[in-house]
């Protein structure tokens, strides 16, 4: 497959929303509520933050939202269409997020995930993220993880 990554435009908002809903929908029952990414306004995110999409033959198959907070460079949302799981789309976006953080002068990148999304935590640990905090925010038990960049 020949994937391409590009900055998202306002016209991509519906496709980004659909991608996120498809990627996170199976967690609703497990955590007892919609995951936070499913409640975000992606038109707003595209206007205010760094949002990227991965396409395959012109179709959005992955989306990435990055931001800068008081804690540093945030990998806010990473979503892959389920039929593209384990096909390299997530890796492309993780590598891009790290490159963006470095380019903007950060020596680390952080993210958070719901404590019941254990497979995400395992994946992030495999690629170098280390848990550094747990917080209850917006009714969600979150695991914070950070990766040092070299």
PLM features: residue spans?
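Acetyl-CoA-dependent GNAT
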Residues: 3, 7-77, 81-83, 94-96, ...
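Short acidic donor-binding/metal-coordinating loop in glycosyltransferase active sites
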Residues: 80, 113, 141
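Short low-complexity, flexible loop/linker segments enriched in glycine and/or proline
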Residues: 125-126, 147-149
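Accessory recognition modules or surfaces
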Residues: 91, 109-110, 144-148
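Conserved GNAT acetyl-CoA-binding A-motif
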Residues: 101-113
